[in-house]
């Protein structure tokens, strides 16, 4: 078996040998062909690269040649331009030198001519002219020397043009200065010296004038401010007397009986003072049964307010004492309706001279008019005494410290408690006008005011207070509203009726008349 197997293997090998030989030959031939193709490709690639290199070298050479040609053309052009420029420069130099020589000749001749006619300056003109004539000979000789020098430069060789130009540059300022005669320089310098002090004096005077004019203008404005004339109606729009009283700041206008002094009433429409932000407008009036009177402004305290509790721990008399310490305060009551102003004042205790006091019997004099009093400010001792007198004398006028918890036995007490309200009230005038604030000053001594019944729009009223006050506007009262106290008669308001006068009231009025007065005032408003 083994021999048989070995024989089969040998037979297969011998049979398969001729079949393998041609395949090997084919493979050899294919390899040779591939090698040849690769060699051809390499040769082609090499030729291609060589062609590219040759082409690149040729193109670079051509570019270099073109650039060289351009450079040559540019250099030639620049050389041509330079030659033309040099030629032009040379010709321009020649022209400039010629013109300069001619101008020098003309300048020298002009200088000689000008020296014959020198300028005179003021009073020293004759002296300057004599100096110029005495120096004329020297100037003529100098001008002739200049002409000789310029002629020598012109007749010189061409090679000396540059040197001549430099010398001309150096000589031009000297020639110009030398052409002008010295006498003229002296005259001009002297005239400038004369003009300078004049200008300096004017410059010194001008700020003085401006300061003086500024001060004069300030004084004029101040005098105008002091001498403003304010027109005040002599009555409150309805008594039939339409004349206007004009006054300055220090004049005294007519007075309506014995009542309180009033501030400016500009007629219709606008308020006199600029203090417009903190002013209250009182529009409603409460009856005796209501707790408080209405007001529109919530920024500052109202007109008829009674402080519940002061920050200092004191009552309204203390606040009156504080407001009385303001040196320029004014007590003003402005009524523009049929409201009633009344009260009683002890005229013997009022500050000021006796000649300026108002008697208690002269209540019916000057009805419906307004008077301004300007007394000297009372001293601090008088103020303290006045505040203590007010605390002692107004026993029925006292206001409790805690206003919310207080009650009154009758309407009479509520009527009597309006004394401190009357001095801190402001009243809006007709239209959009608002009354000025009323700080208490002298009324804190013994003001005892009451409100009486309101009989109608045509009821005649008389002012019963007389006093002298300083006129200083724009004061604000510091009172706050007492919500627990009835405001039946302390409220003030506007009445649209034509007849507006003031009447005095008495202390012993009944509570019924006060109720009717407060209701009629609230209805009229």
UniProtKB/Swiss-Prot annotation:
Region (ASARM motif): 507-525
UniProt tissue specificity: Detected in urine (at protein level). Expressed by osteoblasts. Expressed by stem cells in dental pulp. Expressed by mesenchymal cells in dental papilla and dental pulp. Expressed in teeth, specifically in decidious dentin. Expressed in ondotoblasts. Expressed in salivary glands. Secreted from oncogenic hypophosphatemic tumors.
Region Dentonin, annotated ranges: 242-264
Keyword annotations from UniProtKB, A to Z: Biomineralization, Extracellular matrix, Glycoprotein, Phosphoprotein, Proteoglycan, Secreted, Signal
Compositionally biased spans, kind Basic and acidic residues: 25-46, 64-73, 292-312, 319-328
Region (Disordered): 24-95, 187-216, 237-525
Motif Cell attachment site mapped to chain: 247-249
Pfam families, sorted: Osteoregulin
Primary localization class, coarse: secreted
Glycosylated residues, chain numbering: 256, 477-478
Record flagged with keyword tRNA processing: no
Subcellular location: Secreted, Extracellular space, Extracellular matrix; Secreted
Any one Gene Ontology cellular component term annotated for this protein: endoplasmic reticulum lumen
GO molecular function, one term: extracellular matrix protein binding
Bias type Low complexity, positions: 513-525
Protein family membership: Belongs to the PF07175/osteoregulin family.
Quaternary structure and interacting proteins, as annotated: Interacts (via the ASARM motif) with PHEX; the interaction is zinc-dependent.
Function as written in the Swiss-Prot or TrEMBL entry: Promotes renal phosphate excretion and inhibits intestinal phosphate absorption. Promotes bone mineralization by osteoblasts and cartilage mineralization by chondrocytes. Regulates the mineralization of the extracellular matrix of the craniofacial complex, such as teeth, bone and cartilage. Promotes dental pulp stem cell proliferation and differentiation.
Domain remark text: The acidic serine aspartate-rich MEPE-associated (ASARM) motif is sufficient when phosphorylated to inhibit bone mineralization by osteoblasts and cartilage mineralization by chondrocytes by binding hydroxyapatite crystals during the mineralization stage. It can also inhibit dentin mineralization.
Name used for this protein in its record: Matrix extracellular phosphoglycoprotein
Species: Homo sapiens
